[in-house]
A protein has these predicted regions:
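Active-site/ligand-binding-proximal alpha/beta "capping" segment
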Residues: 89-123, 131
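A cross-family phosphate/adenosyl-ligand binding-site feature
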Residues: 1-97, 135-177
Length: 177
């Protein structure tokens, strides 16, 4: 399965974010899943995948190649890099490739990406697993906002039920197994 992972462009200030990202990558490799990723905290996911002998597809806009490019090595062909024109093209390509979607801790870009995936699920345009990885409660407020949207009539409970929540790589593994 190709798993698209969204997360912060920086590692954040809690070391457990990097630890869980790496653990997620290692699990993906052990199970034969392919990582679809970009940069930032996702580098820890790709390290986990590639260190464990797995495969990854790095999708990055050309303007970020210098500052946030995926690893320059190709790991004997196990790392495929796709250079795209811009961020919307990157986002669309990652949606196209992914057979499951995981949001690790991140900022506005991560929120944008997982929100788009949820919006597509609302219209049945995306019928693949959506997982929010709520490491150390980093998404508690977001998950509460989603629940509030249901109460206030801006989201249906059926859409919210399409989003699974995990707190660790082990829980993600259980959800996708």
């Amino acid at each position: 399965m190709k798993i698209t992972v969204y997360c912060g462009a920086t590692p954040g200030n809690d070391p457990s974010f990097m630890k869980e990202a790496h653990a997620l990558g290692a699990w993906m490799a052990r199970e034969g899943h392919v990582l679809v990723w970009d940069t930032g905290l996702m580098g820890a996911v790709s390290d986990g995948v590639l260190d464990a002998g797995g495969n990854a597809i790095g999708v990055i806009p050309h303007f970020l190649q210098e500052t946030e490019a995926p690893c320059p090595l190709n790991y004997n062909g196990r790392l495929v890099k796709e250079i795209v024109d811009d961020m919307p093209t990157r986002r669309n390509r990652m949606l196209e490739l992914g057979e499951a979607f995981i949001a690790l801790p991140g900022g506005m870009g991560t929120l944008d990406e997982i929100s788009e995936a949820i919006a597509l699920a609302k219209f049945d345009m995306l019928k693949r697993p959506l997982i929010v990885m709520n490491v150390h409660g980093c998404y508690d407020a977001l998950l509460q906002a989603f629940a509030d949207m249901v109460v206030q009539g801006f989201m249906t409970s059926e859409v919210l039920e399409r989003v699974s929540v995990a707190t660790s790589a082990a829980e993600v593994a259980a959800l996708l197994s």
